[in-house]
Swiss-Prot record:
Its EC number is 5.3.1.26. Belongs to the LacAB/RpiB family. The gene is lacA1. This is Galactose-6-phosphate isomerase subunit LacA 1. InterPro entries: LacA (IPR004783), RpiB_LacA_LacB (IPR003500), RpiB_LacA_LacB_sf (IPR036569). It comes from Streptococcus pyogenes serotype M6 (strain ATCC BAA-946 / MGAS10394). NCBIfam families: lacA (TIGR01118), PRK08621.1 (NF006380), PRK12613.1 (NF009257), rpiB_lacA_lacB (TIGR00689).
């Protein structure tokens, strides 16, 4: 499974830490960061790369996570979550089949970021009753 990473200038240092962590865990990383672009362009690049192949997940890091979340949720078929704790990262995969998370580097420290990312990439989608919600989300955008 490939993990797509992106960041703006405010999130790049934390993104690099996340990148190293995921590589150590054995994940294939595709880093689409353009440090000279803002969060909107970088979020769109992450989403585009996610949609290019089945099974990809994405992580976008900026200062607070809110902006990239708003961008991602405007895109057809993109279920995204802004997360700042491990449990939410894990559960958004299990219940919402989220394909992207957004993280705020000014909110989340290095160790918490690693735990968030681990929960997100290892969390299985539960399907079943949750698929109804996912279908509803996919119809909205």
């Amino acid at each position: 499974m490939a993990i797509i990473l992106g960041a703006d200038a405010h999130g790049n240092a934390l993104k690099e830490l996340i990148k190293s962590f995921l590589q150590e865990e054995g994940y294939d990383i595709i880093d689409v960061t353009d440090i000279n672009s803002d969060f909107i362009d970088n979020t769109l690049a992450v989403a585009k790369a996610i949609n290019e192949a089945e099974g990809r997940l994405g992580i976008m890091v900026d200062a607070y996570g809110a902006g990239p979340f708003m961008v991602a949720t405007k895109l057809k078929g993109m279920v995204a979550a802004e997360v700042s704790d491990e449990r939410s990262a894990y559960m958004t995969r299990g219940h919402n089949n989220a394909r992207m998370i957004t993280i705020g580097a000014e909110i989340v420290g290095p160790e918490l970021a690693k735990n968030i990312v681990k929960g997100f990439v290892t969390g299985p989608y539960d399907g079943g009753r949750h698929q109804i919600r996912v279908d509803m989300l996919n119809k909205m955008a």
